[in-house]
Amino acid sequence: MMARCRRFARTTITRAGTLLAAMSLLLLAGHARAEPVKIRAGWVVAPASLIPVLFAKQGLARHQGKSYVLEPVYFSASPAQITAMSVGELEIAALGFSSFPFAVQNAGLADLRIIADEIQDGGKDNFSTHYMVKKDSGIATVADLKGKVLATNGVGTGVHMAMRAMLQRSGLQDKRDYTVIEAPFPTMKAVLLDGKADLIVSTTPFVFDPELQAKGRVLFTQRDAMGTSELSFWTAREGFIGKNRAAMVDLLEDSLRAVRWYLDPANRTEAIEILARFLKQPPARFESWIFTRNDFYRDPDGLVNLEALQSNIDLMRQLGIINADLDARKHANLELVGEAAQRLK
């Protein structure tokens, strides 16, 4: 009798221990599932990219800290984002038409997917990058640039590619017919007015400088050279999207809510104050252009203009910048941002 009782007690204890262990595992699994996904997102220039201030307004990021945690990461240029993505140090890279093909074809990121739009040059008749000469230069047409010095922010950049395309249309070839120098965007006005270059590239906010407006003239725009340009869009690797789809849709929902808040004229004063604080600039510097038609186009639904992007990439191929064709649609996954936009209706 006593032996039977001892066996019963041992069995009961064993079963109880097993049950407790199973419950502990379930609790741990539940805790693991509840941990928000860390999403590191790269950005290069603000306010062209809103990533560093996306959720500065309280109440916009309703899923932040629940299903995901957004961590903005600054980079000096797009190639650095590609490197970070390659080694698993970045979940979202903000790339453009001029850098995306290199990520896929040169860096081996064949699984990189385009997931949401950021800014477009010349989209919906919004601002397009200016290529400017001095009013008294005597340069009236693109053909007049033969033998001249042209300034770009960097050889191989998107604005340099547009410059090459426009001049090639007039029969002018790089090195043979003109000289290209490099200069940062903030110095472009001085480069032009001091006579160091005959043509400069100017974009927001520098293009609205009163002295540049008074002494300079737009010879052509980037839209004139190549139509609408996909300057920046979000990309992520297919494997990360598959494992964290719900969190990604939540992030995109919050980001669309934030972009729409910034674009709403009713919020413009507060939006400018946020940017001014972050960039340590006076609000007056943004008032004439930010979040208006004088700014780059931002799609409120986050939809990438794939037709424009394909045209941009095809031009790169024609100019010999890339060595193989690339089908943008095969590398796009806009289902997530579409689902996010539906939630906001």
Which residue ranges define each predicted feature?
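Bacterial N-terminal signal peptides
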Residues: R15-L28
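Conserved C-terminal helix/tail region of periplasmic/extracytoplasmic solute-binding proteins
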Residues: I313-K345
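Sec/Tat signal peptide C-region and signal peptidase I cleavage site
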Residues: L28-A34
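N-terminal secretory signal peptides that target proteins for export/translocation
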Residues: M1-T12
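Secondary-structure end/capping motifs
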Residues: G242-N323
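Short, glycine-/small- and polar/acidic-enriched structural segments
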Residues: E35-Q173, T179-E182, D198-V201, T228
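Pocket-lining segment of extracytoplasmic ligand-binding domains
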Residues: S98, S137, P186-F278
